[in-house]
């Protein structure tokens, strides 16, 4: 971790969520707290994501970790009628929200928006 301290940009990817074990002695959230860097919260756009995002934002806020953006990733095509996770989450938070559709879609605009948020 120390060797990245003077880097212009370092991306560390966690997996499984903030409370997922990273090692025997810590979780993803512990690493984020240790490196003291802003975070991009990534969540799969499916049923249950609103709960996951709100709980994760609450935990990040509790530990005073800045959230640069929320990325809704890999939108599931078979969602119930009327379900719009993007709009619902957007109404619940002021954190910038990015929606990345599946691999077949053109996501260039959203990726550029995310890069701009990260680099500012």
Residue ranges and their predicted role:
Residues 23-46:
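Inter-motif core of Ras-like GTPase G domains
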Residues 17-18, 46-47, 74-78:
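Short histidine/acidic/glycine/proline-rich micro-motifs that form metal-
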Residues 11-13, 40-42, 71:
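Structural motif
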Residues 1-22, 29:
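Phosphate-binding/switch loop-helix module in NTP-utilizing enzymes
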Residues 58-120:
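C-terminal lobe/tail of nucleotide-utilizing enzymes
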Residues 23-30, 54-57, 82-87:
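Charged helix-capping and loop-helix junction motifs
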């Amino acid at each position: 971790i120390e060797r990245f301290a003077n880097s212009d940009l370092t991306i560390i990817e966690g997996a499984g969520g903030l409370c997922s074990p990273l090692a025997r002695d810590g979780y993803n959230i512990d690493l984020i707290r240790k490196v003291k860097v802003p975070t991009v919260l990534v969540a799969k756009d499916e049923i249950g994501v609103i709960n996951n995002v709100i709980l994760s934002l609450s935990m990040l806020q509790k530990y005073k970790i800045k959230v640069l953006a929320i990325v809704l990733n890999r939108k599931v095509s078979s969602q119930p009628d009327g379900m719009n996770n993007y709009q619902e989450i957007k109404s619940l938070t002021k954190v910038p929200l990015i929606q990345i559709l599946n691999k077949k879609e053109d996501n260039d605009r959203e990726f550029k928006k995310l890069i701009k948020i990260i680099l500012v």
